[in-house]
Structure formats: structure tokens, C-alpha cells
């Protein structure tokens, strides 16, 4: 009996580190810099306790939009310009790639349902295609970077012993930017920064698998 209890205890200790997870997330992201749109992501993780896990995630958000703030500034500083020309100048196409590491804590509601809270930090790459000011038919290309963080809450419902359906709402914070020199309006050359406020709320649903 004593040997059986020892073996059971050892197996119990070893079970938790073997709980790997993989999740696909789909939803809506509404950052301050752009119009809201579809976001897709993958999250992997590993349980180090029955109700605690570390995780990593990678997301992709794409938006093709007209930068209203920039267009208003162009209309203000260049009132004689054609409105359609300034709208073309403000046309922007972005691809956002946040990559994060985090920790999640679960709180059981019932045998099949759980509430959870999560927090993550990481880095972000923003690929930006925007219009050349002098010749708006030509595209300019830049890559912006920043650190980011994210906090959120969600609820999960088991649909089988190895999978669950979940929904969550999170707040994401980041301001990817790049610097450039302006030799037209500044002498000596002025070093300026262009920043995109990619902070905002996202709501997502998905399926998580345990293996």
C-alpha cells in the first residue's frame, strides 16, 4: 500500500508539467491609430500547476484605412490642396505582429466551466505602407517596433476531456514608432519620430486543446 501511494504521488507530480496547450483565437481589435478590424492569433502554453500556466502568443492584425487625423492635419496646413489628394496622401496599410509571453490563472466555476485572468509582455513589429507626400501614387515602406503589454479576463467551457471553448476580452498597449531625418524644414537636419498608437481593446473567441 505504501509503495502504491508513493508511485501515485510521483505520477501526480509529473502530470502537471505535461499539460501542454494550443489555442486558435479569432476576434475583433480596435486600436486607437486605425479603424477596428479582424485579428487572428495562436497561443501555446504549458501548465506548471493545475490552475496556473505560462503561455506565448503570436497575432496578426491587418488594416487598410485612411488616417483621419493625418488627413485633417493636411487639410489644415494645405487648405488649397484637393481634398481627394489629401485623402490619398493619408491612405495607410498596416500589418501588426505582437509576440508575447505571459501567465494565466484559472478559477473554477463548475466542473466544466472556468474563469481566468491573464497578463503578458512582449514586443511588437508594425509594417507600414503609406503614401509619398510629393507623389501620392508611390508607396513608402517602414517597419516600426515597440515593447507591449496586455491584460485580460475570460471564461472557458470544456467540450471534451482534451479541449475547451473560450471567450475573452483584453486590453493591449503599444506605440510602435520609427525615427527619421527631415532636411527640408529643419536645418541642421531634424530627427523626428512617427508613432502609431496600437493600444485598444480586443474581444476574441477560440478553441484550446490540451495534450
Predicted regions and their residues:
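Membrane-embedded beta-strands of outer-membrane beta-barrel proteins
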Residues: 24, 40-42, 99-103, 117, ...
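Predominantly the C-terminal beta-signal and adjacent terminal strand-loop region
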Residues: 66-67, 151, 158-211
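Cleaved targeting-peptide boundary
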Residues: 18-26
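Sec-dependent N-terminal signal peptides
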Residues: 4-13
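Residues that define the transmembrane beta-barrel architecture of outer-membrane proteins
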Residues: 20, 36-40, 93-99, 143-149, ...
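Surface-exposed strand-loop-strand hairpins of Gram-negative outer-membrane beta-barrel proteins
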Residues: 28-43, 69, 144
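Gram-negative (and chloroplast) outer-membrane scaffold detector with strong preference
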Residues: 46-134, 159-162, 198-211
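Extracellular loop and loop/strand-boundary signature of outer-membrane beta-barrel proteins
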Residues: 27-30, 85-91, 134-141, 188-194
